[in-house]
Structure formats: C-alpha cells, structure tokens
Amino acid sequence: MTVVNRSDRRAEFAPLARELGIEIAWATYGDAGTELVHGSDVLMSTVPASAVNLYAEKLGHAPLVDVAYDPFPTRLAAAAAANGYPTALGHVVLAHQAYSQFEQFTGHPAPRKEMWDALVRAVETRDRPQ
C-alpha cells in the first residue's frame, strides 16, 4: 500500500501498520508523480477536493474512489475519468451514509430509490441560478 499524504505522518501510523501486518510506502503530494499511481488497483482520496487540485492531473491515472462531493465532480475525478478510469464519487458515499442513518434513526428500511433520486436531482440543480 502506498499512502500519499499532505504531510509526512508515517511515524504516527507505523505502529498500526505493524499491528495489521501492512507494509506502507509513504509519499507527500509534492513527491507524487504519475508513476506512483500507474498500475494501482485503486486510488482513494479522503481529503477535501481543494487539497489535491494542484496534483489532480498527476494523480488521475488509476481507478478512483473520491469521497469529496463538493465540487462535483472534483478535478481529481474529472482527471481520472478523462484518462479512462472508473470513478466512484462522494455523492455515492453520502447516499450510503444517508441510507444507514435513516435506518438507524427510524428503525425502518431506507427508501433508497427515492433518496437516490432526490440526491441526483440536488446534485444536478445545485449550481443553477434560482
């Protein structure tokens, strides 16, 4: 596993990696080049979209899970898609969180189709003038 982080925090995570038996290679965004992600099974971005905007073109060379949902799509997601890679975007993560929360709060199955349709409508219309 390679972790590309905004700052070098390897010392913080070394004990956990050892405990889990995971070998982690570390890099910062400044070190990251396309060679780091080419051939990766998946690239996961868990930071605000603005944190990777400067590096989106270099990093958008692998299948992507990007949990950011504002802006939609992120520059990283647009770069990955433009390079022909599948993307799973933050609104999908948001929807699944909402399904789970609905079920936990109400004790009833979430109306997933209706919730998904409402989310898609909101995403499609959010940047249009009212």
What are these regions (language model features)?
Residues M1, I24-W26, V123:
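Extended hydrophobic/Leu-rich segments
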Residues M1-G21:
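NAD(P)-binding Rossmann-fold cofactor-contacting core
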Residues S7-A11, D31-E35, T74, K113-D117:
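Generic alpha-helical secondary structure signal
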Residues A11-R18, E57, A81-A82, D117, ...:
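Polar/charged alpha-helical tracts
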Residues L20-A88:
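Rossmann-like adenosine-cofactor binding region
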Residues V67-Q130:
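Adenosine-phosphate binding glycine-rich loop
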